[in-house]
Structure formats: C-alpha cells, structure tokens
Amino acid sequence: MVNLKIKKIDDAAILPECAHEGDAGLDLFSVEEKVIKAGESALIGTGIQMELPPETEAQVRPRSGLALKHSITVLNSPGTIDEGYRGEVKIILINHGKEDFKVEKSMKIAQMVIKPVLKVKVEEVKELSSSDRGTGGFGSTGLKK
C-alpha cells in the first residue's frame, strides 16, 4: 500500500475515501453547490490538492449511480491528473439529462483511481511488426459473433 498525500484547501472538503474495502475508486466530494442545466457542463471543486505517489496518475471517472439515475457523468472520462499537478482537484461534470441537476456540498460527484504509469521512450521507425489484427479498427470485428 502507498500513501496518497491530501491537503484540504477548503473547510468543507472531505478526504477521498473508498466506500467499501477492496473498492478501486476513491469517492470525490463537492465543496460547492451548483446547478448544471440540462445539456450543459460545469467545473466542480473538491477543495483538495494532492501529491500522487511516484510514477502514478489519478484517473477521474464517473459514478455509476449518478450516470444511471441522473444522466450526470464526467465529461473527459477518464480525466487524467498527472503526478506533478498540485492544484485543486476539480471535476468537469456534464448533464446528459433533460432536467437541471443540482450538485450539493458534500455530494459524491466522481471517483478517482490511482494507476501506475509506464514510462516510455518514443522511437521513430520505418516499419512496424505485423499482427493478426493489422490495421482493422472502428468496428472491423463486427457486432455479432
């Protein structure tokens, strides 16, 4: 287990937490109230800053309950928070529903999963090795068996 260092920058901030032992995602909480109109998006503050463990990233993902019950999701999903970022963690939520949605203080608005990052060196080549798939993509495997 590694430590995730969190700094509260708002009195209303709640530390990220897993709802159940073994959960991959840490719930992120709103520190503000804001209405997201139907079809629109909004940037919601969490009131926290963090220091990620070395060679990791945080992926911000939607909460399934908000998506199913209210059509609220994370716009750039998954959102990536890089290891070196030290600003406030903010979440871009979008309302895909037909009614306005009110984000309330202390509401669980997203989840965050900490993932290892593989460091790569970009190498330009003239040719790539062949594969069974080749250049097939965008539906090339069909919809049915």
Swiss-Prot record:
Associated pathway: Pyrimidine metabolism; dUMP biosynthesis; dUMP from dCTP (dUTP route): step 2/2
Binding sites annotated in the UniProt record for substrate: 63-65, 76, 80-82, 90
Keyword Cell division: no
Cofactor: Mg(2+)
Catalytic activity: dUTP + H2O = dUMP + diphosphate + H(+)
Gene Ontology MF terms in the entry: dUTP diphosphatase activity; magnesium ion binding
Signal sequence residues: none
BP GO annotations: dUMP biosynthetic process; dUTP catabolic process
Gene3D superfamilies from the UniProt entry: 2.70.40.10
Enzyme class: hydrolase
Keywords: Hydrolase, Magnesium, Metal-binding, Nucleotide metabolism
E.C. numbers: 3.6.1.23
Domain of life: Bacteria
UniProt-listed NCBIfam families: dut, PRK00601.1
Function as written in the Swiss-Prot or TrEMBL entry: This enzyme is involved in nucleotide metabolism: it produces dUMP, the immediate precursor of thymidine nucleotides and it decreases the intracellular concentration of dUTP so that uracil cannot be incorporated into DNA.
Family according to the record: Belongs to the dUTPase family.
Protein name per UniProt: Deoxyuridine 5'-triphosphate nucleotidohydrolase
Organism per entry: Clostridium acetobutylicum (strain ATCC 824 / DSM 792 / JCM 1419 / IAM 19013 / LMG 5710 / NBRC 13948 / NRRL B-527 / VKM B-1787 / 2291 / W)
The encoding gene: dut
